[in-house]
C-alpha cells in the first residue's frame, strides 16, 4: 500500500495535476492506515493498523495483588492527612504497615485480589506480563567515571613514543660526543703535574658543558614533541 506522503509527492510531481486529482487527496488521507510512531532514537518506524493491536495488548495493566488492593484506600487516606509527604515516603510507610498486619487481617485482601485476577483472565485470555525495563540514569562525577579506553591507549602510545624519542636523542648525542672526544689529543703522562691539573680541569669543564647542553637539548626536544601530541588527546 502506498503511503500518504509518497502519494502526495507523486501527485504534485505529475503533469496532470487537475482539480479532479485534488478531490482524491482527502480520500488518500482517509485510506492511509499507516501509523508512524517516533522511536527512542528519534527515527520513525511505520506500523500498519493490524500490528497496532499488539501495542494495545502491551498497555493492559496487571491485575492488582493483595497489597495494592489494601493500599488504595490507605494511600489516599495518608495523602489527605499528610499533604506535604512525598509519594516515596508514603510507599515506605504503607509497606511497613502491611508487614505489621497479621495473616487474618490480610486474608480478605487476598480473596479480593484472586477475584480480580480471575476477572482479568476472562477479559484478557492471551495476556502475558511483559515488564518494561527503564534505563537508569546514574549521575556520577567525572572523577568516578572510568577512563576512556581510547584516551588511555593514546596516552600509553604517547609515553612510549616519548621514551623512544629521548632514547634516540641520547644515543645520537653520545655518539657525537664520543666522536668529538676521539679527536682530542692524548694525555701526556710525562708532563708536569701543573699541566696534568690544568688538562684535568679543562676536561672536567668541557664535560660539564657537554652534559648541560645535552640535557637542555633533550628537554627542549622532549617538550616540543610532547605539546603538539597532547592537543589531540
From Swiss-Prot:
One MF term in the entry's GO annotations: RNA polymerase II cis-regulatory region sequence-specific DNA binding
Cross-referenced CDD domains: HMG-box_SoxA_SRY
Keywords noted in UniProt: Acetylation, Activator, Calmodulin-binding, Cytoplasm, Differentiation, DNA-binding, Nucleus, Sexual differentiation, Transcription, Transcription regulation
Pfam families, alphabetized: HMG_box (PF00505)
Post-translational modification: Acetylation of Lys-136 contributes to its nuclear localization and enhances its interaction with KPNB1. Deacetylated by HDAC3.
Localization: Nucleus speckle; Cytoplasm; Nucleus
InterPro entries listed in its UniProt record: HMG_box_dom (IPR009071), HMG_box_dom_sf (IPR036910), SRY (IPR017253), SRY-related_HMG-box_TF-like (IPR050140)
Region entry Disordered, spans: 180-200
BP GO annotations: cell differentiation; male sex determination; sex differentiation
Domain of life: Eukaryota
Gene Ontology CC: one annotated term: nucleus
Known DNA-binding region: 60-128
Family statement: Belongs to the SRY family.
Function: Transcriptional regulator that controls a genetic switch in male development. It is necessary and sufficient for initiating male sex determination by directing the development of supporting cell precursors (pre-Sertoli cells) as Sertoli rather than granulosa cells. Involved in different aspects of gene regulation including promoter activation or repression. Binds to the DNA consensus sequence 5'-[AT]AACAA[AT]-3'. SRY HMG box recognizes DNA by partial intercalation in the minor groove and promotes DNA bending. Also involved in pre-mRNA splicing.
Record's subunit section: Interacts with CALM, EP300, HDAC3, KPNB1, ZNF208 isoform KRAB-O, PARP1, SLC9A3R2 and WT1. The interaction with EP300 modulates its DNA-binding activity. The interaction with KPNB1 is sensitive to dissociation by Ran in the GTP-bound form. Interaction with PARP1 impaired its DNA-binding activity.
Protein name per its UniProtKB record: Sex-determining region Y protein
Species name: Pongo pygmaeus
